[in-house]
Amino acid sequence: MLYSLFKKYLFRLDAEEVHEKVCKILKILSRSPFFCNLIHAQFGYTNPKLENEILGLHFPNPLGLAAGFDKNASMIRALTAFGFGYLEAGTLTNTAQSGNEKPRLFRHIEEESLQNAMGFNNYGAVLGVRAFERFAPYKTPIGINLGKNKHIEQDNALEDYKAVLIKCLNIGDYYTFNLSSPNTPNLRDLQNKAFVSELFCMAKEMTKKPLFLKIAPDLEIDAMLEITNSAIEAGANGIIATNTTIDKSLVFAPKETGGLSGKCLTQKSREIFKELAKAFFNKTILVSVGGISDAKEAYERIKMGASLLQIYSAFIYNGPNLCQNILKDLVKLLQKDGFLSVKEVIGADLR
C-alpha cells in the first residue's frame, strides 16, 4: 500500500532520474550490514522447499534480479536483501561507456512495461570489479553479464568479449554473454552459430565457472534453436531466455528506439521458452525471464522447464514486497499440487 502511494509520486518523474536516485540510496545501504539485515527481515523470505543446487551453486530460491538494474555491481548487498535468490550484475563492458542519448528509459504504465534504449552504460570492467569486491563475498550466487563496447567493430567482437572476461575472472559465480541487447548497433548480428561457437570455446578455456548465453525473443524459432545448440556444443552451461523485444506492437504508444520488457513481453517470452524447453530441457540449464510478475507465472515457467527465473520490470512496478509475495505464493502452489519442493516442479509439464 505504501509503495503504491510512493509510486504515484515517482512515476511523475523521469524514469532514469528515479532509477539513479534509487541506486544512490541502495549504494549507501549496501555499506551497512545492519541496514541490509533489516531490509531482509522485512522483505526477505526463506523456505527450504525453494532451495536448489544448480551447477555447483546453492540458490536459496529460484527468483533472480536480471541484469541491467545494477549495471556496475555496486549495490548487490542491498538488492539481494530484498529476497532474491541470486542477482545478475552488469552489463559490464571492457571499457567505460556512457550509453545512448537521453531520454532512453520510458514507462508504459498501462501495460506495466518498460522500454529502454540505454546502450550498456557502465563504468567499465575495472571499476565494476572494484565495486563488486568491496562487499564480497555475498550470500547468494552472483552472475556477471558481459557485453561488447559500442565502438568495437564486429570483426573484433570476440577479442572484446575476451578482454572483458579476463578482467572479470576473479569476480562472480557465473558469466552471461549478452549478444541480444537491441541497443548496441549490430550486436544481435552476433547471434549466429559461428560466433557463438567461437565465443564459448574461448570462454571455456579461460574459466571453469558456469557460462550462459542470453538470447533475444525476436529470433525465428529455428534460428534460436540452432544458436542454442551451437552454444551448448561449445561449452555453454545454460541459456537465459529472453532479453527485451523490439516488437513495438506489444504496447499502445511505443517510443522509436529501445527494447520492451515487463507484462507486454509475457506471452512472447513464454512462447519462446516453451520451444526452447521442448528441445533442450535436461540438456542444459534453462533460465526464464520476460514478463514474470506473480507466482502463477513463475510457477508456469518452472513447470515448463525453468530451473531459475529472473525479473526486472515487475520489481519497478510492484516494489520491495514482490519477491516475498511471489515466493510465498509459489510455495502454496507447489504444495497444492503435491510437490515437496521446487526441484520436483522443474519440467513437470514435460514429463
Curated annotation (Swiss-Prot):
It is found in: Cell membrane. Binds 1 FMN per subunit. Belongs to the dihydroorotate dehydrogenase family. Type 2 subfamily. Transmembrane segments: none annotated. Substrate binds at residues 71, 116-120, 178, 183, 243-244. Its main location: membrane. It is a peripheral membrane protein. FMN binds at residues 67-71, 91, 145, 178, 214, 242, 262, 291, 312-313. SUPFAM superfamilies: FMN-linked oxidoreductases (SSF51395). Catalyzes the conversion of dihydroorotate to orotate with quinone as electron acceptor. Its EC number is 1.3.5.2. This is Dihydroorotate dehydrogenase (quinone). It holds the Pfam family DHO_dh. The lineage of its organism: Bacteria, Pseudomonadati, Campylobacterota, Epsilonproteobacteria, Campylobacterales. Its cofactor is FMN. GO terms for cellular component: cytoplasm; plasma membrane. Monomer.
